[in-house]
Amino acid sequence: MLEPTDPLVRARRVFYAGMGALADAIAAAAPPETAIHIKWPDALYVNWGLVGGGRLAWPNSADEASVPAWLVFGATIRTAWSGRIDPGLTPELTALDEEGFAEVNSKQIVEGFARNFMQALDSCQEGGFAMAVRPYLERLARESRHNCEIDENGDLLVQPVSGGATERQALLPRLKAPAWLDLAYKEPS
């Protein structure tokens, strides 16, 4: 649980620090040559298969212009198949044990996440938000012909390298309804 000092409209950017910390924790535990990517804003992929994602919660009564009483970053990662999904029929989905993480336990990933997240929060206090969001942007899956930035309110700004109009992708609606999460089964799908 976090106690933000910024209004909600800016405080929710901490989500990117959480996602970057999670991706880096999984990368640190991964076998060599394992690709770890984030699909904007909240889905985590290992070797281009969905393994999970992150979520951010805040009080329902929180106003965008006011400092919320709390924020909570949470994540769901599929470490092994639940039996509900046949991995042979769903190549777009995967589990950590299928990607060579057999010797890795959840405790190692949680510890790595905690270290990375605390470091990201410290970086944010010392060097500003741009420092904390760097690990996220480095893992963001995007076309090489685009530059990406995170706006003050957390929206993704996508700028073609060749110039042209910047595209804005709103964060708030995506946090309210994560596309990667099957709410009925409470697992990535």
Regions found by a protein language model. Name each.
Residues 1:
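Active-site-flanking beta-strand signature of metal-NTP-handling nucleotidyl enzymes
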Residues 4-33, 50-189:
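Long, positively charged amphipathic alpha-helical accessory segments at protein N-termini or as interdomain linkers
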Residues 36-48, 77:
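Catalytic palm active-site di-aspartate
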